[in-house]
Design a protein with these regions (language model features):
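Intrinsically disordered, low-complexity segments enriched in polar/charged small residues
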Residues: 7-8, 117
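Bacterial N-terminal signal peptides
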Residues: 8-15
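Non-heme di-metal
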Residues: 19-204
């Protein structure tokens, strides 16, 4: 009887401790900010793609579509982690401005630069401190992808200014798990970030 009571008290104590464990407040805040940022980027890049098409810049439009898909995957991943922490994301409306494709590319470069050099490093520092491993993973996938997007956008802007957009990739592949993005002619056998086989990639 004493053993049963002791075991029961341990279980109750564990449940009580679990219920009263502190929430990773900063990481929750960062996940929400990341969801807003990635969702907005996804919608914005689709709008940029339509603008590029209207200007006859099909290769740049493809790049924007691929990046939009990747950003959407990042938003979904961030949302899953947030919900596993018992928090729901509030509704919001993405806000952005569409200009010329040259201006849109520069805006995209600026956004990706901020995310990879400032936003995600800060998010990762907080996630590591609060020991939220799944947040660390989704933030890392997003940050590493943004580095590649910046490179693609920088190349596209240079080719646009040189009136040589026909030399850009005519297609892209996006990992459905982490959002990693490849030029269609440079796809790995498996995603370099998460190991997903290339036959699962989304072809743009």
């Amino acid at each position: 009887m004493k053993k049963s009571l002791f075991a029961l008290s341990i279980i109750v104590l564990m449940i009580f401790s679990s219920c009263n464990s502190p929430k990773p407040v900063k990481t929750i805040e960062n996940l929400k900010a990341g969801i807003i940022g990635e969702t907005t980027a996804s919608a914005k890049y689709l709008a940029f793609a339509e603008k590029a098409k209207s200007e006859g810049l099909d290769t740049i439009a493809k790049l924007f579509v691929a990046a939009s898909k990747a950003e959407g995957i990042h938003a979904v991943n961030h949302t899953k982690v947030l919900e596993e922490l018992g928090v729901k994301m509030e509704a919001f409306t993405p806000e952005f401005v569409v200009k010329t494709t040259e201006e849109n590319l520069q805006a995209a470069i600026d956004g990706e630069t901020y995310e990879q050099t400032t936003m995600y490093p800060g998010f990762l520092e907080a996630a590591d401190a609060e020991k939220v491993e799944k947040a660390t993973k989704t933030f890392t996938w997003a940050m590493d992808t943004e580095k590649k997007h910046k490179e693609f956008y920088t190349k596209a802007l240079a080719m646009l200014k040189a009136h040589n957009t026909g030399s850009l990739s005519f297609g892209y592949a996006v990992c459905p798990v982490c959002g990693n993005t490849y030029e269609a002619n440079a796809v790995d056998n498996a995603c370099a970030f998460c190991g997903t086989p290339k036959d699962k990639f989304i072809m743009i």
